[in-house]
Amino acid sequence: MAKFVIRPATAADCSDILRLIKELAKYEYMEEQVILTEKDLLEDGFGEHPFYHCLVAEVPKEHLTPEGHSIVGFAMYYFTYDPWIGKLLYLEDFFVMSDYRGFGIGSEILKNLSQVAMKCRCSSMHFLVAEWNEPSINFYKRRGASDLSSEEGWRLFKIDKEYLLKMAAEE
């Protein structure tokens, strides 16, 4: 299968993006944590001030999934800023359906993301990978990624909404 297109997502792609987000969450054993809706994706990514950007991988009709889908991969990203090095492209989610891996789709998505990062004068691209996900770790390392957890000793933290509300209400 040599034919596929990587393109910016449109509002019409939201149902496919959500489907792929759920597939990725299932792959990561976190399926029950997806609470996002198609409406959220539409409002958050395609309004006046989008919170995210997205690329999709689309195959022609002769290569549709068994369920009839043409969107077989996606990358969701946004821009952020590091006060030490400047602009960053943060890759939030990146997934290609298992039946479509090995055809260069993931490599082409990453190439497109790299072009976006360079066009926007970003100094690097950051992302998370589950420790157990050796195929993805190897995919990124083959392309020059470095593991900041082991090399620089950083830890990722989060503050859930209930604690944000509590802190926001403090006097």
From Swiss-Prot:
<feature type="binding site">
    <location>
        <begin position="133"/>
        <end position="136"/>
    </location>
    <ligand>
        <name>acetyl-CoA</name>
    </ligand>
</feature>
<dbReference type="GO" id="GO:0004145">
    <property type="term" value="F:diamine N-acetyltransferase activity"/>
</dbReference>
<keyword id="KW-0012">Acyltransferase</keyword>
<keyword id="KW-0963">Cytoplasm</keyword>
<feature type="binding site">
    <location>
        <position position="152"/>
    </location>
    <ligand>
        <name>substrate</name>
    </ligand>
</feature>
<comment type="subunit">
    <text>Homodimer.</text>
</comment>
<feature type="binding site">
    <location>
        <position position="92"/>
    </location>
    <ligand>
        <name>substrate</name>
    </ligand>
</feature>
<comment type="pathway">
    <text>Amine and polyamine degradation; putrescine degradation; N-acetylputrescine from putrescine: step 1/1.</text>
</comment>
<dbReference type="GO" id="GO:0008080">
    <property type="term" value="F:N-acetyltransferase activity"/>
</dbReference>
<dbReference type="InterPro" id="IPR000182">
    <property type="entry name" value="GNAT_dom"/>
</dbReference>
<dbReference type="GO" id="GO:0032918">
    <property type="term" value="P:spermidine acetylation"/>
</dbReference>
<dbReference type="GO" id="GO:0042802">
    <property type="term" value="F:identical protein binding"/>
</dbReference>
<feature type="binding site">
    <location>
        <begin position="27"/>
        <end position="28"/>
    </location>
    <ligand>
        <name>substrate</name>
    </ligand>
</feature>
<feature type="domain" description="N-acetyltransferase">
    <location>
        <begin position="4"/>
        <end position="170"/>
    </location>
</feature>
<feature type="binding site">
    <location>
        <begin position="102"/>
        <end position="107"/>
    </location>
    <ligand>
        <name>acetyl-CoA</name>
    </ligand>
</feature>
<dbReference type="InterPro" id="IPR016181">
    <property type="entry name" value="Acyl_CoA_acyltransferase"/>
</dbReference>
<dbReference type="GO" id="GO:0005829">
    <property type="term" value="C:cytosol"/>
</dbReference>
<dbReference type="InterPro" id="IPR051016">
    <property type="entry name" value="Diverse_Substrate_AcTransf"/>
</dbReference>
<dbReference type="Pfam" id="PF00583">
    <property type="entry name" value="Acetyltransf_1"/>
</dbReference>
<feature type="binding site">
    <location>
        <begin position="126"/>
        <end position="128"/>
    </location>
    <ligand>
        <name>substrate</name>
    </ligand>
</feature>
<protein>
    <recommendedName>
        <fullName>Diamine acetyltransferase 1</fullName>
        <ecNumber>2.3.1.57</ecNumber>
    </recommendedName>
</protein>
<dbReference type="GO" id="GO:0006596">
    <property type="term" value="P:polyamine biosynthetic process"/>
</dbReference>
<feature type="active site" description="Proton donor">
    <location>
        <position position="140"/>
    </location>
</feature>
<keyword id="KW-0808">Transferase</keyword>
<comment type="function">
    <text>Enzyme which catalyzes the acetylation of polyamines. Substrate specificity: norspermidine = spermidine &gt;&gt; spermine &gt; N(1)-acetylspermine. This highly regulated enzyme allows a fine attenuation of the intracellular concentration of polyamines. Also involved in the regulation of polyamine transport out of cells. Also acts on 1,3-diaminopropane and 1,5-diaminopentane.</text>
</comment>
<feature type="binding site">
    <location>
        <begin position="94"/>
        <end position="96"/>
    </location>
    <ligand>
        <name>acetyl-CoA</name>
    </ligand>
</feature>
<feature type="binding site">
    <location>
        <begin position="140"/>
        <end position="143"/>
    </location>
    <ligand>
        <name>acetyl-CoA</name>
    </ligand>
</feature>
<dbReference type="GO" id="GO:0009447">
    <property type="term" value="P:putrescine catabolic process"/>
</dbReference>
<comment type="similarity">
    <text>Belongs to the acetyltransferase family.</text>
</comment>
<dbReference type="GO" id="GO:0001525">
    <property type="term" value="P:angiogenesis"/>
</dbReference>
